[in-house]
Amino acid sequence: MRSSIHASRLRKMGQSIPASTGPMARSANRFLQNRAAIFGLVLLTPLLFAVLTYPLWLPYKPNDIDLMAMNSAPSWKHWFGTDGVGRDVFARTMEGGRISLLVAVSSVVLSTAIGFLIGAISALGGRWADAIAMRSVDLAMTLPPVIFLLVLASIIGSGIWSTVVVIALLSWPVLSRMIRARLLELREREFVMASRGMGAGLGHLLFRHGLPNSIDILVVYATLQVANAILLEAGLSFLGLGVPPPAASWSNMLNAARSTAVLEQFPWQWLFPGGALVLAVLAINFIGDGLRDAFDPRAELN
């Protein structure tokens, strides 16, 4: 009664009644107030636009060879200069961004799927499923990551999709533990217990209850893991186990320019792809930190 009287008084005074907002709207508002996250978006958006659209407006292809312009410095004709066989460094930097981001995003999608399924099955599948899943996670986390990465890469081989598989197999255990912790709390709630009592199967529990209640973890993990995957691909390609030439990626462009002569005499061959890699990783980390703060449940208490 008092609330209706108060609302009618507000209407008479011409004041609007504040509408309640949902958790997603509040998270979006917190993200938009994060200056570092917005700065990351400002950095990443033009880079993504250039990487995705460069074939439409750039006259050079990544593997076009011009023997008359080998090791040319940056100019109006070749904005980032050329490499040792006359290939346009700007075109290769844009193509390298495509391949590096393709490897990173694909590996993150695969590792996110593996991590969610194992963590959710561990939490919702019963005692034996929990024991088996967690022992596999413990085994994966005890392996030295660098040695594990090199052994997997040498077994599977080099190539774009081989690199995707290698990075994904290294990245899923942390996510599975996070998902398990979230869903162990969820499975004791009334609506999940009611679903179990009505005979709901594991698939229903995973995708009807587990997935919607893990979206915040998945979004934050995937965003931050993209930056980590770019760096892992860079390490593999720098060691000759990632994306093989002549395909361009930021990391194998750096690998091709690591000789002393190139480092000292032709710095544009490593400066531009290295700068693009650093900017992309920095921007994605800023965005990931912003998403993590936006989805932080402790922010609801402030």
UniProtKB/Swiss-Prot annotation:
GO terms for biological process: peptide transport; protein transport; transmembrane transport. InterPro entries: BP-dependent_transpt_permease, MetI-like, MetI-like_sf, OppC_N. CDD domains: TM_PBP2. Belongs to the binding-protein-dependent transport system permease family. Probably part of an ABC transporter complex that could be involved in peptide import. Probably responsible for the translocation of the substrate across the membrane. Keywords: Cell inner membrane, Cell membrane, Membrane, Peptide transport, Protein transport, Transmembrane, Transmembrane helix, Transport. Residues 1-22 are annotated as: Disordered. The complex is composed of two ATP-binding proteins (BAB2_0817 and BAB2_0818), two transmembrane proteins (BAB2_0815) and a solute-binding protein (BAB2_0812). This is Putative peptide permease protein BAB2_0815. It comes from Brucella abortus (strain 2308). The chain crosses the membrane at residues 38-58, 101-121, 147-167, 230-250, 268-288. Residues 97-288 form the ABC transmembrane type-1 domain. It is a multi-pass membrane protein. Its main location: membrane. Pfam families: BPD_transp_1, OppC_N.
